[in-house]
Amino acid sequence: MYHNHHFEFEYGKESGKLMIDRLISEIDPELMGFTVDTYWVQYGGANPANLIKRLKGRCPVVHFKDYAIDISDESSCVHMAACGSGNLDFKEIIEAFEYAGTEFVCVEQDNCYGEDPFACLERSYKYLKELGLE
């Protein structure tokens, strides 16, 4: 299982191809599946829902992590956020993982920026439940 971050959405110096494209096309699907991390896909400049759909049958797990832009903090304006607190379209992402045959979703937030992690998790849970995720 391969878990993405942002650097897979950069072009390789020698190949001139996106690293994620090479992983998808050059590794046998029987040998490796993908765990798509929504935050890191967006951070890399791609659309998480589009990637999940592209990986139909190869993406049994998705990590839900929202992507927030906070202009009040000039030192680091991009933050991980509780689901529904950022800019990602989770309705579209849910539709994509249903299409792709994804079996598991993990809610993840690496940094809560001083907030109680359980409060962040509760916000994510309530938001995703409102979207119909069971």
Question: Where do the language-model regions lie?
Answer:
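Conserved anion-binding
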Residues: 1-10, 19-20
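Short secondary-structure boundary/hinge segments and terminal tails
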Residues: 10-11, 115
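Positively charged, amphipathic and often flexible ligand-engagement surfaces
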Residues: 14
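Histidine-acidic metal/acid-base catalytic patches
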Residues: 17-36, 40-134
